[in-house]
């Protein structure tokens, strides 16, 4: 969020946003949590569309913050009905990160090609077998995929602690009952530059899968 110090109106808005940020990230715990990961610095819990309304309400509050940080409209929730939500709860009783996974059937490989990059920037897709998905160029040849990562977010004060990687590991293990989603069965939706860096590092390739 951008504001101007010294501008009374901006400082008031910023103060309200900061208060909302702290309040929404606070998490005292639920009686019937579905814990899918436990660590020395916190735990990961899972929420689905079938979860209690108060649980889904908390997820939406977190997504408002995540959307702001990731550059999406704060009220944007383009999530399929079969979505799975994972929240990382730190030992200081705050939501430190979240990931949203959803079922997909196919995705496309990101293309790293100088000509493609120029073409995408000018929005003139002329290369054969190339599509544009969000901000990225990708192959028009779809490949099978199982799990789409709609959002992956970690609070700024908790970054560089492998929280995103642990969220992804848990998502892969618990997205489908009795099946661990493979790295090559994961796809990301229009990642930010930081998100692209993470996706490449986590999957071990710059040509990871994207979907829309």
Residue positions per predicted region:
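Glycine-rich acyl-CoA binding loop
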Residues: 159-171
């Amino acid at each position: 969020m951008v504001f101007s110090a010294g501008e009374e109106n901006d400082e008031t808005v910023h103060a309200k946003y900061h208060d909302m940020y702290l309040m929404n990230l606070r998490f005292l715990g639920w009686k019937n949590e579905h814990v899918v990961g436990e660590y020395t610095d916190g735990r990961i819990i899972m929420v689905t569309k079938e979860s209690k309304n108060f649980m889904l309400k908390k997820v939406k509050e977190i997504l408002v913050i995540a959307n702001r940080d990731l550059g999406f409209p704060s009220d944007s929730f383009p999530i399929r009905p079969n979505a799975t939500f994972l929240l990382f709860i730190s030992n200081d009783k705050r939501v430190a990160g979240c990931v949203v996974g959803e079922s997909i059937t196919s995705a496309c490989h990101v293309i790293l090609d100088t000509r493609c990059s120029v073409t995408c920037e000018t929005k003139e897709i002329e290369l054969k077998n190339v599509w544009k998905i969000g901000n990225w160029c990708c192959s028009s040849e779809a490949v099978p995929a199982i799990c789409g990562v709609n959002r992956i977010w970690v609070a700024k004060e908790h970054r560089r602690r492998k929280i995103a990687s642990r969220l992804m590991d848990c998502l892969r293990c618990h997205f489908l009952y009795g099946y661990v989603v493979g790295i090559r069965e994961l796809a990301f939706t229009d990642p930010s530059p930081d998100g692209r860096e993470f996706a490449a590092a986590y999957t071990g390739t710059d040509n990871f899968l994207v979907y829309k």
